[in-house]
Amino acid sequence: MGEGAISEGWRGGLARFLVLYAALYGAYGLLSPILPGFLAARGLSPGQIGTLLAAAGALRLVVGPLAGAFADRRRAARPVLAASVALTGLAVLAHLPGAGFWQLLGPALLYAAGTAAPPPLADALALAAARGGAVFQYGWVRAAGSAAFIAATGAAGWLIGSYGLAAALVASGVLFIAASGAALALPVRDGSAKAGGWLGRNFAELLRLPRFRRILFAGSLVIGAHALHDGFAMILWRGAGIGAGTAGLIWSGSVAAEVLVFLLAGPPLLARIGLPAGIAVAACAGALRWAVLACTTVIPLVAAAEALHGLSFALLHLACLGLIEATTPPELRATALALYGTVALGLSGVLATLASGALYGAFGASAFWAMTALSLAALPLVPGLRDR
């Protein structure tokens, strides 16, 4: 990309999107790893924590698509994003005085409602501002989010060690509120509201598009196959004698590969091979990754397999978002991304996670062969994603 295009990108809001994604995903990184521990410290039993997290997940599945449809209907993605993130920040801070299940139920559900919409709404705004890569690459801002998540996760450990669990919640709440301000500072692209109508019409219009349905299904299969890894990879490695520090480095390598693909490797690769082929590459990379984990715990092989996360997750995300942008009308973009992120990927992750526990309990590492099959199941959908 030439110097003039980069300058136009900064004028078009690249710097503001970088700030938004860094603040938003940094706030997630501060809170996500430690929230169950905080709930336990405030007197919740494991069963109550599971109930709370399950209720929060179910609420997100409802709120996310509705918020996306409302933002499209009212042409208000930017203010809806800002309001959602502000609500999230206040909900995080509202956890601080609570103790016990009933006192923390309200803040937890508010947090779930607030976090349902921001990622797809931010993506919709970033894709519109990027203009298909003519102004800037969407991957640049998403890489900033991933890098901020990693940094914030490390910072959370330092904050907790120095000041206690509550300090990480305060920092997360403040960052969410800062992200709300960053959302309001984005370039104004909100148009006139459409005439009122049933929000479900947005969903119906999108689900009538065959290519969009295939994108949802393919993305669900490849992302859903990550569930066993996310829940049990650390348990597998520690059980095989891999130390906590080494296991952490292996995991960090996978996230570093994600940042690399978002920032540098992904956009030129997709420009060369095409978006549908990108989904095929992601599916094959995922299948190879899970096959290696099914067969061995030899550290160099596991580390090499984990580097495939850049393809199995980041390349898939870039390809799916590019196809959604090419397939869906702009006035339904926030709804489309909310369906992709909240329902297709979120629901598939929940279902695959439920299955993963039983699979790992019955078969141990060999359960990863099921994830290999799940990834490869996306390949027959790829021809239907091409332009006709």
Model-derived features: where do they sit?
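Helix-to-loop junctions at the C-terminal end of transmembrane segments
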Residues: 62-76, 160-161, 261-274, 360
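Structural signature of the two symmetry-related core transmembrane helices
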Residues: 79-93, 173, 277-292
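Cytoplasmic helix-loop-helix junction between adjacent transmembrane helices
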Residues: 108-144
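Juxtamembrane intracellular "pre-TM" segments in multi-pass secondary transporters
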Residues: 2-11, 183-221
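Intracellular juxtamembrane helix-capping segments at the cytosolic ends
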Residues: 35, 116-131, 315-329
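Symmetry-related core transmembrane helices of the 12-TM Major Facilitator Superfamily/SLC fold
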Residues: 167-185, 366-384
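Helix-loop boundary and gating motifs at the non-cytosolic
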Residues: 7-57, 61, 211-250
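Hydrophobic core of transmembrane alpha-helices in multi-pass small-molecule transporters
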Residues: 22, 91, 95, 101-119, ...
